[in-house]
């Protein structure tokens, strides 16, 4: 048996030697002879390597190629891994250039593998989806909102459509935090042929709106998917599952939409999770700001490598100015020497940040304090931004944490000190702004800087004084430090400047108006030629009769005529020279006086109008209605203003002028409106600068006891004595009734009757003024028909018979719009709010009928009826006549404001007769409502539920 085993043993030994020599020769070829190619790769092994590379399993293979100390061409790198797969046990563990063991995972290896892994079809598709998300130009735009956001789709024919404009007017800047808190995103579609377009309005967590244009080709697809009707305004509210939650055929108040959303169970969880969200959102200060974006989805959230992240951070670090303290250098050496600590801290970065740290330490020579921010990773840069991430505090080195607490208070002042040139450039603005802010509160807080501000605006006389103050203020290092006390300038001129500059009409009046000192100069200079002209006239007067004598006597000689002409020329030359001399002297005197004594005696009689002068222009001619309001948007003032603007004609016949004072007591502006008849001469009582004269306004306030910052109103007669005080807005009818009892008014009425003076209301009353007449006072029931013989219109009129009490108690006004084309007209029926049966009727002009139909999108060719609430929004639409008004009353009585009215009316005992409305009286309805009467009309809740008005 031993002789049989011998050949087998020798064969095994020979094969072992051959294999060993082959592996050694391959190792020598790869290490010692890089120029030779190794022909030992079998086709099977190469196919397996290609298969692994294509399926994404060649990560280990690619790593081994990167571990070679001297890699050559791409073909060589491609061939080496095949040998490794064929003989995995022969090769020793990988080593570096100097023989030191290499870490298994290095940053360059990851980069190399990533470049090879691009061949993977699945990963490239994923990265493509991340780089180009479903944006506004993508057909699956709704899919980007699925599971995350609710979608509010607004569809309109075009941007100028009436309903669309009405809906956008309801979207004030202060509603977007509420929308963001409910995860609502908006899509606007314009579907009219030729004007197709739209936009996606993404609302951020700060309330900012990111607008992206919508691809017009997507409009028909979205319209068909959401089942929106073309040619009409409509809105759809989608759930987070993209199911339709609610449809709205006309604009609605946002409260109604909120109520629909808040009924969902998921909304309760959102409320718990997002406590204080709205307050934080509003505190950001950018609520309602619109930012236009491209149509790539605004995302760009692609998977960027770690290397690209480092490249993004480096330029941000290089921009930091050397404002930190030198001891921060110690943290640089600590971060540079130990390699393991950065690994758990910097977002799964292996020791690659070591190279960044060494690079940063080499820059310490040029910038002293920069290395701290470089080695501390993004966490150290966060304290310099406005928002702090929660992880930045825990991973920050202790030295940097101390420095942030020390530097914390100074961040609000100025983060990075500017160079000296920029400091000098920015100093005047820094000293000017805080004083402007304080001037709104009080005028005596910082007088030196206010004088400096005023003097920079002045041109001419005060320029020397300005230069000196400029030099003083440039000496201060801190821009927020108020300069030292200057010499107080006495007199009235600086105060006037100070007051004018401190009010809100500064830009309007102060830029175009010269200062009073210039006005004095111009007045004096203008007076001088007039005196010289008088003197020259005196010289010329005796010469004229001499000429006449010479002509009459005919005895004068030509030489005498020549002499007289020479004398005239000499006199003219002298007068011109005297004019120029006096101009120079006066100009020099005024400049010297202003330089040495800013308030000379000739400046004292300023053209400021006193209260006596102001009231003297009204006395015996006009009655005054004086109103004070803290701001022009004050609700009480707006209500009173709408009241008197509606009755322009009655104000004019009673000769009323309205003086309105805006702003607080110490910083007010004034507006004067004269209501006059057509045959009266237009009045101009004060100049523009007097409207912002604080002294005049404060004196006027004291004269009539209007020394508060609240709404207040005073009525006077033509003798300017106070007749009535009002602390709240009041109907102008009661004011007119009071005025008609004055003795002066009775005389005016008799005089106007004799002269036949009548006042016609404005022929072209605007739609806005007409609708503002009913806002927050009346509900409108608009009925439109092609003519008064229309069948539906006549049926509706029969249903309205005998409903005067119900209409009056519900504050309903009926507006009838009749006619087609040019033959149109309207009738307005006003029902008393006490429920009496008397009805006041007014004619509505043709142009207003057309405007109302266009505004509410009512077709003149068909019958239609709509209910408009007190807030001016359409509450319900009725395309056919309502045989019974029960449904209309149900809708009105379910509104929040109406419930308050019902409580007041019941306490006062105001009610309609039980038999008037066929057993559906006021009391019986109230009982039915308490018992759930509204459930019988549940189909109305989808459109009208939740309306507060």
Curated annotation (Swiss-Prot):
Glycans are attached at residue 467. GO terms for biological process: extracellular matrix organization; positive regulation of cell-substrate adhesion; response to bacterium. It comes from the Eukaryota. It holds the Pfam family DUF4174. There is a cross-link at residues 544, 547 (Glycyl lysine isopeptide (Lys-Gly) (interchain with G-Cter in SUMO2)). Induction: Down-regulated by oncogenes (isoform 1). Isoform 2 is down-regulated by beta estradiol in mammary gland (at mRNA level). Isoform 2 is up-regulated by beta estradiol in mammary glands (at protein level). Up-regulated in lactating mammary glands and mammary tumors (at protein level). It is found in: Secreted, Extracellular space, Extracellular matrix. Phosphorylated. Residues 345-360 have a biased composition (Low complexity). Promotes cell adhesion and matrix assembly. Residues 308-328, 419-429, 463-477, 499-511, 534-548, 556-581 have a biased composition (Basic and acidic residues). Transmembrane segments: none annotated. GO terms for cellular component: basement membrane; extracellular matrix; extracellular region; interstitial matrix. Residues 436-453 have a biased composition (Polar residues). Isoform 2 is expressed in uterus, liver, lung, spleen, kidney, heart, bladder, skeletal muscle and brain (at protein level). Isoform 2 is expressed very low in mammary gland and intestine (at protein level). Isoform 2 is expressed in lactating mammary glands and mammary tumors (at protein level). Ubiquitous (isoform 1). Isoform 2 is expressed in ovary, uterus, mammary glands, liver, lung, spleen, kidney, heart, bladder, intestine, skeletal muscle and brain. Belongs to the CCDC80 family. This is Coiled-coil domain-containing protein 80. The keyword Ribonucleoprotein does not apply. It comes from Rattus norvegicus (Rat). Its main location: secreted.
